[in-house]
A protein has these predicted regions:
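Acidic, low-complexity, intrinsically disordered peripheral segments
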Residues: 2-3, 9, 69, 78, ...
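N-terminal signal peptide c-region/cleavage motif recognized by signal peptidases
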Residues: 19-21
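Bacterial Sec-pathway N-terminal export signals of envelope proteins
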Residues: 24-80, 122, 237-238, 243-282, ...
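Short flexible linkers and secondary-structure junctions
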Residues: 26-159
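Sec/SRP-type N-terminal targeting helices
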Residues: 44-48, 61, 106-108, 122-150, ...
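Short segments within alpha-helical structural elements
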Residues: 52, 214-236, 399-457
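Small/polar, glycine/serine/threonine/aspartate-rich low-complexity segments that form flexible
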Residues: 71-117, 247-251, 297-341, 465
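Periplasmic alpha-helical coiled-coil/stalk elements that build and connect Gram-negative outer-membrane
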Residues: 152-267, 430, 437
């Protein structure tokens, strides 16, 4: 039994030690924001998209390189030909070459074709250049999308952080309320047993203890709920967190001023502007489709055949040997330039240019709308922050008065100078005042978060106040 008890004590000690270690490390808000940006799967997905667009930009730059084609073909067949015309619809005609013979025969031999082909777009009148720029614009848009996704995640993480902090503070308030209720019950129960007060007072005091315990349990449920939310945003397993007391013991300094209403650098606006720039670049690319293309080409070719050069005079002058037909008997080269211009594109692509211009116009209008909404949201946040400051000052007055009233009613009840109803009302008032105080203090930070999110700058929230 002694050994078993030692094992139990050791196990409990390990659990307590792990719990203490878990609570010993304070999770600061700036650290939480960093961890969310690194671990959240949605952010990882956006980073992969950015990498994909980076590779697309590299591919577009590689379009400056020439097309170089190497090919080797070996075949076996006849070379019967006749005079006449034909059109090879949907593909190439037969590659057999010969003069027409007097009659059909089925002589067959091996043949071969080897060639190297180079085609280089020397001058595309800006088409490839604009394709590269469009690829770079898409990459910038993907980066802007990643940044706004990180910003939105960090706003949600900050809200979850503050909500968890508020729930922890409310749990602490309910624990203090439970302690007061238990002290009150012990005092009432002892006096009731002594016959100084009716037994019903002790029963009511016991009910108050149960009610306080219920409120404490419900407050802990909220702590667990917001802990889960924060853990999800951090990309971690469910756990409890010890948060920075800065956001529960102080309020931010008053930063309201006209200079703090700039929203031009908001990540959402930056993303929308990058979409506008991408659309403008698409306009430039579409315009180049109306222009000609100048290219250089070169071909080096070698051919072999099992048919001899005098086959037309002597139909037996051929060999069915594979090695005879796959060698190179003749070679040719070809060099030149090609200037191609589909002149109907001058008319055809006018509609495509106008189409893209309308897309650009739509994106600009969306940008203007978003800018107005963020400006309005910023002004609203400033007003709400000012109200939060004022409300917090009022809750301090409320809490001070409730604490004084509770102490007075406690003294009066202990001396039999007030009723149980008056005392419990003072107890309720103090609990409500403590809750209002904690909520009002947290609301100041929540209002500051709203201001930071509307202006696109979370440093307003994370800087030391």
């Amino acid at each position: 039994f002694l050994t078993m008890n030692i094992k139990i004590i050791a196990s409990v000690g390990v659990v307590l030690l792990c719990s203490l270690n878990g609570y010993a490390q304070v999770l600061h808000l700036d650290n939480a924001l960093q961890r969310s940006a690194e671990n959240y799967d949605r952010i990882k997905s956006k980073k992969s998209i950015v990498s994909a667009f980076e590779q697309n930009t590299v591919f577009q730059k590689q379009q400056y390189l020439p097309d170089v084609t190497l090919a080797a073909q070996q075949s076996f067949g006849t070379i019967n030909m006749v005079h006449g015309s034909m059109y090879a619809y949907g593909g190439l005609a037969s590659a057999s070459t010969s003069l027409p013979l007097a009659e059909q025969n089925w002589n067959a031999a091996f043949g071969s074709l080897y060639f190297a082909n180079v085609n280089w777009n020397l001058f595309t009148f800006g088409r490839i250049k604009n394709e590269v720029k469009l690829g770079q614009s898409k990459e910038k848009t993907a980066i802007a999308d990643l940044e706004q996704e990180i910003f939105q995640l960090q706003v949600k993480t900050s809200a979850a952080y503050l909500n968890l902090l508020a729930s922890q503070r409310l749990q602490f308030v309910q624990e203090k309320n439970l302690e007061r209720a238990q002290v009150f019950f012990e005092m009432t129960d002892s006096r009731a047993k002594s016959g100084l007060i009716p037994e019903v007072d002790a029963s009511l005091a016991k009910a108050e203890v149960s009610n306080a315990k219920s409120l404490q349990i419900k407050s802990y449920d909220k702590v667990l709920e917001y802990s889960k939310q924060l853990a999800v945003f951090l990309g971690e397993e469910f756990q409890t967190y010890q948060l920075d007391s800065l956001y529960s013991t102080t309020i931010p300094k008053n930063i309201l001023s006209p200079e703090n209403s700039d929203v031009s650098k908001h990540p959402l606006l930056q993303l929308q502007q990058s979409k506008v720039d991408q659309s403008l670049q698409s306009e430039s690319l579409v315009k180049t489709q109306r222009l000609p293309n100048l290219s250089a080409f070169g071909v080096l070719q070698g051919r072999g055949s099992g048919f001899e050069s005098n086959y037309m005079q002597d139909n037996s002058a051929y060999s069915g040997s594979y090695l005879k037909g796959v060698g190179i008997d003749r070679g040719n080269y070809l060099l030149g330039f090609t200037l191609s211009w589909n002149i109907t594109n001058l008319y055809r692509f006018n509609s495509k240019v106008k189409e893209q211009q309308y897309f650009t116009q739509s994106l600009k209008q969306d940008y203007d709308l978003l800018h107005k909404e963020l400006n309005a949201q910023s002004k609203l946040a400033q007003s709400q922050l000012a109200n939060a400051y004022e409300n917090f000052e009022e809750t301090k007055v409320q809490l001070s008065a409730a604490q004084l009233a509770y102490r007075q009613h406690t003294a009066l009840y202990e001396n039999g100078l007030t009723t149980l109803v008056d005392y419990t009302q003072a107890l309720y008032a103090l609990n409500r005042a403590e809750i209002d105080y904690e909520i009002a203090q947290n609301n100041v930070w929540q209002a500051l978060l709203l201001l930071a999110s509307s202006q696109g700058d979370l440093e307003i929230l994370t800087q030391k106040h």
